[in-house]
UniProtKB/Swiss-Prot annotation:
This is UPF0246 protein SEQ_2141. Belongs to the UPF0246 family. One of its GO terms (cellular component) is cytosol. GO terms for biological process: response to hydroperoxide. It comes from the Bacteria. NCBIfam families: PRK02101.1-4 (NF002543). It holds the Pfam family H2O2_YaaD. The lineage of its organism: Bacteria, Bacillati, Bacillota, Bacilli, Lactobacillales. InterPro entries: YaaA.
């Protein structure tokens, strides 16, 4: 069975219904460390303005007091990749695929199923906070590595920020899809292309119930097709040809 890893997104959009929120035990030290920061320190930790930090402080306080609403993570996150992922009108098989084979890597919650109920928050691995003297990456690494050890065939749709939390010995075993567009005879890639394509790729996987590496190579989605010539054992290239 294939296991897919995807990143979180800064942009969030709550979609009813909401649920009671319960913070995982491993996330509590992070919440406590963030709660100790002054508003100015919080702004520096997030690299945001004081006004935005004030909003985040209220969110953190609500989480700490058990007053936050929670939403399925794949519905709450609303970045470019998530907007290009099929999230509504899923068949039971597609919903099962999304909830049992796709996991979200979070700097606040750890590695969670896509349907895990989470609260609105702002957090990534660039957040400047230490937990018992450790960076966020080092704090989560043992748990991330254990996940990689327990899941033998990982398909990584992670950016460097999230991938680097894992030890390199696990990273080198993954398959990492790469997405490029042909423009004026040249192959181009940038974050917008990659984010949109990740969502379309994952949609194709759940719609086709992809379970093998060979099936990944047969996928066609949003104009992208697998390119045998560029691909390696661990990097699968998908190219969108000029029309």
């Amino acid at each position: 069975m294939l296991t897919f890893l995807i990143p979180t997104a800064k942009e969030m959009k709550p979609v009813p219904p909401c649920y009671p929120h319960q913070l995982p035990q491993k996330s509590l030290p992070i919440l406590e460390a963030m709660a100790e920061l002054s508003l100015e320190e919080l702004a520096r930790a997030y690299s945001i303005r004081i006004e935005a930090a004030s909003k985040e402080a209220k969110r953190l306080k609500a989480i700490a007091q058990g007053q936050s609403s929670a939403y399925p993570a794949y519905q709450l996150f609303n970045g470019l990749m998530y907007r290009h992922l099929k999230r509504d009108n899923l068949s039971k098989d597609q919903q099962d695929y999304l909830s049992k084979q796709v996991y979200i890597t979070s700097s606040f919650y750890g590695i969670i199923p896509t349907d895990e109920k989470i609260a609105e928050h702002r957090h990534d691995f660039h957040t400047k906070v230490t937990i018992n003297g450790q960076s966020l990456k080092h704090y989560w690494r043992p748990i991330y590595d254990q996940f990689a050890k327990d899941h033998k065939q990982i398909i990584s749709l992670l950016s460097n920020e999230f991938r680097d939390v894992f030890s390199k010995e696990y990273q080198k075993l993954w398959i990492s899809p790469k997405f490029m567009e042909e423009r004026s005879g040249q192959l181009k890639t940038h974050s917008t292309i990659s984010k949109k394509a990740r969502g379309a790729f994952l949609t194709a996987c759940l719609e086709n119930n992809v379970q093998t590496k060979e099936a990944l190579k047969q996928l066609s989605f949003a104009g992208f097709c697998y390119n045998e010539e560029l691909s390696t054992e661990t990097n699968y290239y998908y190219i969108k040809k000029e029309s």
